[in-house]
Design a protein with these regions (language model features):
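Active-site loop-to-helix "anion-binding N-cap" substructures in soluble metabolic enzymes
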Residues: 1-224
């Protein structure tokens, strides 16, 4: 983390790290005097105290000094997080003044049945229900079938789906300034192609971010 903060490329890009809960406190402390920001990978859908052994609340995350939170990741959805549960988490996180990175995306079955837009519409409508404004919301488009598989949609497919997301947000919140990231098997080999998509604002990087050299290579190729 410190090496990245000292990189000459740091000034040209914004970095948000979302480590496991057990490392949140350490990351917050190590990045305190840098411009690197820290986020959590999830939170519980109830914010108060109660019989929720093993869970962590948005309030607890905020108290650590964390500023961001990923919600709706496909792996959490596969563990049982419905759009309704994700919506509760979003509303709680926004109340705690956390900046939400909401993940949306279709499965391989959805793609084969050409239901990508329908899926995105349902996820966005349900997950953002009762949200009054899009402030502190970032959308990450992550096709479920692409995560960790090495398979990546074509640039045209990503552009089309990101365009839909941006138009949806613009219509819902009367604001076109929404940040949309792409996530799904992003690595140093395909970043040169992916960065050509002119309507995405950044990347949600998974496995490749765990290796310093690979990650810096991605950053270099994104900026140059």
């Amino acid at each position: 983390v410190i090496n990245i903060s000292r990189s000459k490329f740091f000034k040209k890009a914004k970095f948000i790290y979302c480590p496991p809960f057990t490392l949140l406190d350490q990351f917050v402390k190590k990045t305190r005097n840098t411009k690197i920001e820290v986020g959590a990978q999830d939170c519980h859908f109830v914010n108060g105290s109660g019989p929720y052994t093993g869970m962590i609340s948005a309030n607890q995350i905020k108290k650590l000094g964390t500023k961001y939170i990923i919600l709706g990741h496909s792996e959490k959805r596969s563990d049982g997080d419905t759009n309704q549960i994700i919506n509760k988490k979003i509303l709680i996180s926004i109340k705690e003044k956390l900046k939400v990175i909401l993940c949306v995306g279709e499965t391989l079955k959805d793609k084969k049945n050409k239901k990508e837009i329908n899926v995105l519409k349902t996820q966005l409508n349900s997950c953002l229900k009762n949200l009054k404004q899009k402030k502190n919301i970032i959308i990450a488009y992550e096709p479920v079938w692409s995560i960790g598989t090495g398979r990546v949609p074509s640039n045209a497919e990503i552009y089309k789906n990101v365009k839909y997301i941006k138009n949806f947000i613009k219509k819902k919140f009367k604001n076109k300034n929404i940040v949309v990231l792409y996530g799904g098997s992003v690595n140093q080999k395909n970043i040169g192609i992916l960065k050509k998509i002119n309507n995405i604002d950044g990347f949600l990087i998974g496995g490749a971010s765990q290796n310093y050299n690979k990650f810096i290579d991605i950053v270099k190729k994104t900026i140059i």
